[in-house]
Amino acid sequence: MEDLLDLGGERRRGSTTSGPRMGRRAQQESAQVENHLSGKNSSILTGEVAPPPKPPRRQGGWADDSMKTSKSGRRASEEVEEGSHRLRQQSFGGSDDGGDIPVIPDLEDVQEEDFALQVAAPPSIQVNRVMTYRDLDNDLMKYAAFQTLDGEIDLKLLTKVLAPEHEVREDDVNWDWDRLYTEVSSELLSEWDLLQSEKEDPMGQPAHT
């Protein structure tokens, strides 16, 4: 009952307040108030109660962290893009200024130049000098130590029988193939004739008197 009395009082107040107003706005406001009051009265009479409003959704824990990380990731990506854009502008500006770009030579060219400038050093090989006959004769004449071998073998008998150099040494002569062939063939024929004659006369008598 009290609710009905309150509703009646509200209607009266609404009528008193809306009475002096004229125009479209006043009519719209009065219509809204009446609809609101009629809906309220119908809900009270039927016994239905309007559901309570839903509380606002609260986010916390992992949701907040994910939001923060997403925001921080966006900021980091934006900063990286800005830095790359600045570097590109600086590189373009440096190229426009006409700066000298260093030229790096190829490795093959460098190696070829080094090999061309290098000079091969002569090989250092120790060669034992071969003694000539003259050196041997001089050593035998001057040094008595060479007359004995290992301090035990006496070489005096051998040195006495040695022929002089001019008898043993031969002159260097260029050989002619035809001449050499004729000399060798004549020597062989002479030896063959001598053998044939010895076979015919086994007593050793000369074949020609």
From Swiss-Prot:
Q: Which GO terms describe its cellular component?
A: cilium; cytoplasm; cytoskeleton; intraciliary transport particle A
Q: Does the keyword Acetylation apply?
A: yes
**Which residues are recorded with the post-translational modification Phosphoserine?**
S77
Report residue spans for region: Disordered: 1-100
Q: Where is this protein localized, as stated in its record?
A: Cytoplasm, Cytoskeleton; Cell projection, Cilium
Q: Which residues does the record list as N-acetylmethionine (modified residue)?
A: M1
For bias kind Basic and acidic residues, which ranges apply?
A: 75-85
Q: Which InterPro entries match?
A: IFT43
- The answer to whether keyword Acetylation applies is yes
Name the major location. Answer: cytoplasm
Q: Which GO terms describe its biological process?
A: cilium assembly; intraciliary retrograde transport
Q: Which cysteine pairs make disulfide bonds?
A: none
Q: What is the top-level taxon of the source organism?
A: Eukaryota
Q: Which UniProt keywords apply?
A: Acetylation, Cell projection, Cilium biogenesis/degradation, Cytoplasm, Cytoskeleton, Phosphoprotein
User: Which regions span the lipid bilayer?
Assistant: none
Which residues fall in a compositionally biased region of kind Polar residues?
28-45
A Pfam family of this chain: IFT43
- Entry similarity comment: Belongs to the IFT43 family.
Assembly information from the UniProt record: Component of the IFT complex A (IFT-A) complex. IFT-A complex is divided into a core subcomplex composed of IFT122:IFT140:WDR19 which is associated with TULP3 and a peripheral subcomplex composed of IFT43:WDR35:TTC21B. Interacts directy with IFT122, WDR35 and TTC21B.
Could you tell me what this protein does?
As a component of IFT complex A (IFT-A), a complex required for retrograde ciliary transport and entry into cilia of G protein-coupled receptors (GPCRs), it is involved in ciliogenesis. Involved in retrograde ciliary transport along microtubules from the ciliary tip to the base.
Protein name (Swiss-Prot/TrEMBL)? Intraflagellar transport protein 43 homolog
Which species is listed as the source?
Canis lupus familiaris
